[in-house]
Amino acid sequence: MAKKTISRLSVLAVLIVFLAACSKTSEYTNVIPADASVVASINLKSLASKAGLDDKENEAAKQKVLEALKSGMNAATFQQLEKVMNNPSESGIDVEAPVYVFTSPSFPYSTAVAKIKSEDDLHASLEIMVKEQICQPINEAAGYSFTTMNGGLVAFNNSAVMLISVKGTSQIEKAKEGITNLLKQTADNSIAKSG
């Protein structure tokens, strides 16, 4: 009797973990519109592994890059960069989850979407980029934060970060209007429903 109960509880526990994992994954994919004409998935961890970035042979090259960068930035910036290079998840982006790239008629900008692991870490990473004048200061909008950089708009909330390819101020303003809707979008209105 006890074995049967343990067996059933084990199956239930596995099912709960599976459902929880699925719901977390789909939350950030809800920003992908249902009418997306092209969607590509990129597995960053697999890509880094295949590129040999985890290999011991590349450790020396990584250290040389860090040393070269160290001379051109202040200590706090370098410390954050070194932390992210040694552990990419410190960037605030969940590198274990797929990154999706999409285009759609309703949001006609090439967009990459990644899962947020830590909104605070992402803010810290972007603040470093602001200090190094790589991007503009972070601003708040209707339910999300954003910054701009050369040819790109980065928008994020607590679950998703979007990198949108835009050209000029008029496209940035139009994209910002659409971002509000995408970040509030439910699974019913997203590609998650058709997946």
Give the label of every model feature segment:
Residues 22-148, 169-170, 174-195:
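Structural boundary/hinge residues at secondary-structure and domain interfaces
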Residues 153-174, 178:
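Charged, amphipathic alpha-helical scaffolding segments
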Residues 10, 105-106, 150-159:
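Short, surface-exposed loop and linker segments with low hydrophobicity and enrichment for Pro/Ser/Thr
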Residues 1-20:
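Sec-dependent bacterial lipoprotein signal peptides
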